[in-house]
Amino acid sequence: MDEEFLMISGIQHFVFCRRQWALIHIEQQWNDNLKTVEGEIVHEKCHNEKLVEKRKDLLICRGMRVFSRKLNVFGQCDVVEFKQGTSGAILFGRKGLWQPYPIEYKLGKPKKDISDILQLCTQAICLEEMLCCTISEGYLFYDEIHRREKVEITNDLRQKVVEMFAEMNDYFNRGHTPKAKYNKKCRNCSLKDLCLPKISKVRSVNTYYEINLEGM
């Protein structure tokens, strides 16, 4: 895949913090913490591309690679379930139509923000573009609560995804990394030692005083 294609998973970082996303995807900086390592373990269990299960009218594909030229993104779906029915996509070597449902596995429990939902919606848009079909729903599976959460792929979510990736592509093409703005989310960020948001905040205050004291 073209190196200039953005990663689907990046939308999670972008929702959490635009600077974090830029540090990872533009400046190629990364630090692991306990949560990121645990998250990688959860996904390793899903990304076995050779494992395809067939259960009656259900086809289960793991680690499926997807992309969208419209959004300029690529990535992997943890799981895509194809259910045979009267609508969906035509699959090579399979009879009939198969309706795809993306399933994303997540650490912990449902988040307060919509980052997981937007990532799932992006996967759905990619699958639609690749398979020439329509996807109305997908699922988020959280390991802490051990159940799926159904997500409706609405027009509002689709528009939000389009707008966010347009902004991300703009930042990426310009090589723009937003300035640090310290807030409560910074405490649990794996990049806080690279970002140094508190130092950036102090520096901006010092700059303010320097500018305002010069004329005194």
Model-derived segments and spans:
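Metal-dependent nuclease catalytic cores that hydrolyze phosphodiester bonds in DNA/RNA
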Residues: M1-P102, V202, Y209-M216
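Residue-level signal for secondary-structure boundary elements
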Residues: A22-L23, L34-K35, N169, N173-A180
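Structural motif
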Residues: E4-Q12, I114-S115, T177-K184
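Cysteine-centered metal-binding/redox modules
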Residues: M1, I125, I145, D170-H176, ...
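Cysteine-cluster motifs in flexible loop/terminal segments that predominantly coordinate metals
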Residues: C17, T177-M216
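Short, charged low-complexity intrinsically disordered segments located at boundaries
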Residues: V42-K45, V52-K56, K150-R158, S190-V202
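Nucleic-acid nuclease catalytic cores
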Residues: G75, E81-G175, R187, L191-D193
